[in-house]
């Protein structure tokens, strides 16, 4: 059982779902109905787990080349590729059935698109072919926002798209920081992550570009959701703290990987705090 849970990458799933509940709260202009929220979170966990399991099957030959991933269950033989594929397919179907029965048609469709996009577009088409893989492939990680919103309203508003773009622009600096830390691993696997194929200066410029757009999108989100002005001030402050980490990356060039690891951890903290802020601001408005 442990091996199958590892296939789902539950720690990654948890991060994806951090944005789902705030999206539902914003869409409902308050707390969504408990049963709907539970069904969305549970089915979303299965859907993301399905995509991750397919990813492990497809990338098992690459994973064995990387120290960070060499102990994954398909690589070690704990779970066969066939069984992992059956498991991924099964929980993916179950997630879609739950979405269809307990949420909305649009949420179900978006979930299907998210799984296919992550597995086919990102894992199979982009990841090993372009240094911009995470920029476009990362769109799959933004889908929980749209799915959560659609589960409540069966539609998508400008506010939902604003939240989508916050995550979209957050994703590259988040993953590039990780790629800096594990640069040698990605190089060994032949994965052209930007920090592997580009100069430090180029990587830093790209991280700055996406961070600035992330902050701008977060401002758009607060305004589109008509949240209190105090939440706008806090949102901007969180974004500036995020940006400060990039300054530390340049200043800490002698400990480049170590500073990048701190940026990766802060990016998770940033998204978590922003999500909590959105819920609190909506409930108090």
Would you name each region that the model predicts?
Residues 1, 58-79, 176-203:
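Cytosolic, membrane-interface loops and tails of multi-pass inner-membrane proteins
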Residues 18-21, 72-73, 136-152, 201-202, ...:
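Small-residue-rich segments of transmembrane alpha-helices in multi-pass membrane proteins
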Residues 18-60, 68, 92, 97, ...:
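Membrane-embedded alpha-helical segments that form the functional core of polytopic membrane enzymes
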Residues 46-54, 116-123, 165-183, 215, ...:
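Transmembrane alpha-helical segments that form the membrane-embedded catalytic/substrate-channel core
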Residues 68-109, 199-223:
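Multi-pass membrane catalytic core of lipid/isoprenoid biosynthesis enzymes
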Residues 81-152:
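Intramembrane alpha-helical segments
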Residues 146-156, 214-221, 270-285:
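Hydrophobic alpha-helical transmembrane segments in multi-pass integral membrane proteins
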Residues 243-273:
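Interfacial loop-to-transmembrane junctions
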């Amino acid at each position: 059982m442990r091996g199958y849970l590892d296939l789902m990458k539950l720690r990654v799933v948890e991060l994806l779902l951090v944005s789902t509940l705030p999206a539902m709260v914003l869409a409902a202009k308050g707390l969504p109905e408990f049963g709907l929220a539970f069904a969305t979170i549970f089915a979303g966990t299965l859907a993301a787990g399905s995509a991750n399991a397919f990813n492990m099957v497809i990338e098992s030959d690459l994973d064995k080349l990387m120290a960070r991933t060499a102990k994954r269950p398909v690589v070690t033989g704990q779970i066969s590729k066939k069984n992992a594929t059956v498991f991924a397919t099964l929980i993916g179907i179950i997630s879609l059935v739950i979405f269809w029965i307990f949420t909305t048609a649009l949420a179900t469709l978006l979930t299907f698109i998210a799984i296919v996009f992550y597995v086919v577009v990102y894992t199979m088409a982009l990841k090993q072919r372009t240094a911009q893989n995470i920029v476009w492939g990362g769109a799959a990680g933004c889908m929980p926002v749209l799915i959560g919103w659609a589960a409540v309203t069966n539609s998508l508003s400008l506010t939902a798209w604003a939240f989508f773009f916050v995550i979209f622009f957050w994703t590259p600096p988040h993953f590039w920081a990780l790629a800096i830390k594990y640069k040698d691993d990605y190089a060994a696997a032949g994965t052209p992550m930007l920090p592997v194929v580009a100069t430090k200066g180029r990587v830093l410029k790209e991280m700055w570009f996406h961070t600035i757009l992330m902050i701008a999108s977060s401002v758009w989100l607060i305004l589109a959701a008509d949240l209190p002005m105090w939440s706008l001030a806090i949102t901007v402050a969180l974004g500036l703290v995020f940006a400060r980490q990039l300054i530390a990356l340049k200043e800490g060039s002698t400990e480049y990987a170590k500073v990048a690891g701190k940026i990766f951890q802060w990016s998770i903290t940033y998204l978590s705090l922003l999500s909590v802020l959105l819920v609190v601001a909506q409930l108090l408005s």
